[in-house]
Amino acid sequence: MSDSRLRRRQGTAGTDNKRRADGPHDISGLLDGVSVVLLDIEGTTTPITFVKDELFPYVCSHVRQHLEEHWKEEECQEDIAALRKQAKEDKEMDGVVLIPECTTKDDDEEARKKVLSAVVDNVLLNMDADRKVTALKQLQGHMWRAAYQTGKIKGEYVKLTFADVVPAIRGWLETGRQVYIYSSGSVEAQKLLFGFSTEGDLLELFSGHFDTTTGLKVETESYRRIAKTVGCDPANILFLTDVVREAKPSREAGMKTCLTVRPGNAPLTEEDWANYPVIKSFSELACDVSPTKMRSRGKAAT
């Protein structure tokens, strides 16, 4: 590298570091006109390690036990049927584990064991691939619910939210905004997480929840459905997520989008920093002006 190029790079190092830390986008007006804040969970409201290091391992280590204990229950059989159906749809995928047919009335213990083993293998394979299919998320939610009810997972075990999350949400609510959750985890799992928080039951903070039954988070149409369901123009919805593959379709649907940088999250690329507003804390989005007043102020200015 030439001396002149080196001097230019050294001269801009401070600017580059500031841009990486704060991003090139002005976030001061990000809440302008926003009536609904839509939140991702993992890596946004909640440490990514909580889900990956605590909840997911619980499912992996207890799925066989859960199936054995709840085998004759209708809900368990519905979970198995959903996984079986998904496996059939995935039959062209490498390594897919198909699940044999079997009912609770089947007296063949060997048949039951084969089904149980196939379900376990299927679940572990899908989790290893980090699949977001509804059948898997449904079973996970039911397992976590049972774990909470039996004390296998206790309330104090759930250090759910970053410290800036609840104060920011309360502030948004006070200024007339609504807050919704959109996560790959089932709605039931979402409610367990926020209902058993160390900060108490936080469910009252949310106007509603969305999961993969609405659509995959990487599909533009999913965000259009959410906007229609909440009765809000996409332009008046702000979606916060740590995943660019989710930010892109939400923006394509017309929503405002902001990426979150949290400890343990995957690093953003230079392109990500350039293309999206980025925050490290919800406190950066504090606002004391209601969306209605903000919109009327904008009309007056024109």
Curated annotation (Swiss-Prot):
It is found in: Cytoplasm; Nucleus. Residues 16-25 have a biased composition (Basic and acidic residues). One of its GO terms (cellular component) is nucleus. It comes from the Eukaryota. Residues 1-25 are annotated as: Disordered. Keywords: Amino-acid biosynthesis, Cytoplasm, Hydrolase, Magnesium, Metal-binding, Methionine biosynthesis, Nucleus. One of its GO terms (biological process) is L-methionine salvage from methylthioadenosine. Its EC number is 3.1.3.77. Its cofactor is Mg(2+). Bifunctional enzyme that catalyzes the enolization of 2,3-diketo-5-methylthiopentyl-1-phosphate (DK-MTP-1-P) into the intermediate 2-hydroxy-3-keto-5-methylthiopentenyl-1-phosphate (HK-MTPenyl-1-P), which is then dephosphorylated to form the acireductone 1,2-dihydroxy-3-keto-5-methylthiopentene (DHK-MTPene). Monomer. This is Enolase-phosphatase E1. The lineage of its organism: Eukaryota, Metazoa, Chordata, Cephalochordata, Leptocardii.
